[in-house]
């Protein structure tokens, strides 16, 4: 255990650099955690802030015994070294990493820890929300859509699509036994750490309880925001080089590579207006060729990592020609929502003739309001659901507009692709709301008002 006495249940490690504006809220949320403070410690590691952050930390450390603050001798340039030092100094059985501008729910982590303790879990996942100026949105819903235990962490579907610290608790022993540390990178250091951590954890719990809030308000500047698309892509290439050589379960490795190919390159590099507007597209293409070469050198075919039909079609257009690829990206960004048709109760995308060599894209689930019906002396709102045969409806919710943290589960009946909701049930504390269909465990679709 690294020579330390493990006498706390949970250690909260927070790296800090010039976050004076946000620290009070972050620290207060830790103070407000519904847990005996003798069982937890909060370790704040300051990366030689040039504002008043360290003085704020010292004030809280003087006032609360469970709060510690450490300052590095010189600025390290990123969160990796402060986090590693915090983990090294921690005395908790479990650790969670918190960003200094974020905040926690009072009951979320305490309840998740109890759940992990009861079931002997190595890692736990709770629901996180990204707070932006105009809205609040769920983060990584695939890791926190229900209460469940006894899960194999790296087998949770899409788990590697969310490789940041938000909403995660893990055993300290996993990082020590496998020497898992954060790498000192300007971007993507989380991917390497959590990819290895999740892959080498043996058991997991998840909860749909709210645990973590991510600060993405416009007045919050981070290294991630300051890193442009090309620079991020180059960091992701370095991450791919490291990950593909790691000793990980083969299934986990393939899921991680799939995430890098689909999300970090096809989605976040190519399917963007900035790519179409670029006067130097060869830079983008050269990076993607390097990705393919890295994958090929290790005995894989990039098509083995394409799971989403949208991205698969993009890659096939890329193979056809760069001109077709750029036309396909333009279609997906500007025209895809305008060209649809219904066949066999499934919504299809109507491609231009130039893409007739590509399989037709279809939507898993689309729901449309079909009016108010009066039946058996009761008013019902009727929703028609267009869906693939293998799509399973899981539930119906009211979700506050622009705030996914506020929601209400509805009772419903479903017959022949029609969902029936009692009109009197459609209220959400006087908020304006959307009706949302939950399907295939964690996926969701907002109901359209009309065709």
Please give the residue ranges for each predicted region.
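Short amphipathic alpha-helical coiled-coil/interface segments
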Residues: 49, 260-264, 287-295
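P-loop NTPase catalytic cores that bind/hydrolyze ATP
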Residues: 240-241, 252-276
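Short, surface-exposed acidic
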Residues: 250-254, 303-305
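Short, charged low-complexity intrinsically disordered segments located at boundaries
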Residues: 88, 204, 225-228, 265-274, ...
């Amino acid at each position: 255990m690294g020579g330390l006495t493990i006498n706390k249940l949970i250690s909260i490690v927070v790296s800090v650099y010039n976050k004076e504006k946000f620290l009070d809220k972050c620290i207060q949320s830790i103070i407000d955690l519904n847990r005996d403070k003798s069982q937890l410690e909060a370790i704040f590691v300051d990366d030689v802030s040039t504002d008043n952050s360290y003085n704020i930390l010292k004030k809280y450390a003087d006032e609360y015994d469970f709060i510690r603050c450490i300052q590095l001798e010189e600025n390290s340039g990123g969160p990796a070294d402060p986090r590693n030092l915090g983990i090294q100094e921690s005395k908790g059985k479990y650790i969670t990493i918190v960003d200094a501008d974020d905040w926690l729910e009072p009951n979320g982590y305490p309840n998740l820890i109890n759940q992990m303790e009861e079931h002997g879990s190595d890692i736990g996942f709770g629901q996180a929300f990204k707070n932006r100026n105009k809205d609040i949105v769920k983060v990584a819903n695939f890791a926190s859509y229900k209460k469940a235990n006894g899960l194999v962490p790296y087998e949770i579907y899409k788990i590697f699509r969310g490789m940041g610290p938000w909403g995660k608790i893990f055993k300290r022993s996993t990082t020590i036994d496998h020497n898992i540390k954060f790498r000192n990178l300007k971007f993507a250091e989380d991917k390497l750490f959590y990819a290895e951590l999740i892959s080498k954890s043996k058991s997991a719990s998840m909860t749909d309880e709210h645990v973590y809030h991510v600060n993405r308000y416009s007045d919050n500047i981070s290294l991630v925001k300051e890193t442009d698309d090309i620079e991020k892509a180059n960091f992701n290439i370095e991450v791919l080089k490291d990950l593909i050589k790691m000793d990980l379960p083969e299934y986990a490795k393939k899921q991680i590579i799939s995430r890098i190919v689909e999300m970090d390159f096809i989605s976040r590099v190519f399917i963007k207006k900035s790519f179409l507007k670029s006067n130097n597209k060869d830079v983008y293409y050269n990076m993607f060729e390097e990705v393919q070469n890295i994958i090929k050198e290790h005995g894989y075919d990039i098509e083995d990592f394409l799971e989403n039909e949208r991205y698969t079609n993009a890659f096939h257009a890329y193979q056809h020609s760069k001109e077709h690829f750029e036309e396909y990206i333009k279609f997906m960004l500007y025209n895809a929502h305008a060209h649809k048709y219904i066949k066999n109760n499934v919504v299809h995308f109507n491609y231009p003739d130039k893409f007739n060599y590509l399989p037709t894209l279809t939507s898993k689930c689309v729901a449309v309001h079909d009016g108010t019906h009066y039946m058996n002396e009761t008013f019902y709102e009727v929703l028609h659901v267009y869906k693939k045969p293998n799509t399973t409806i899981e539930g119906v919710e009211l979700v506050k507009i622009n705030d996914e943290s506020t929601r209400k589960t509805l009772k419903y009946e479903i017959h022949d692709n029609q969902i029936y909701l009692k009109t009197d049930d459609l209220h959400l504390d006087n908020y304006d709301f959307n009706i949302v269909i939950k399907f295939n465990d964690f996926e969701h679709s907002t109901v359209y008002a009309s065709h």
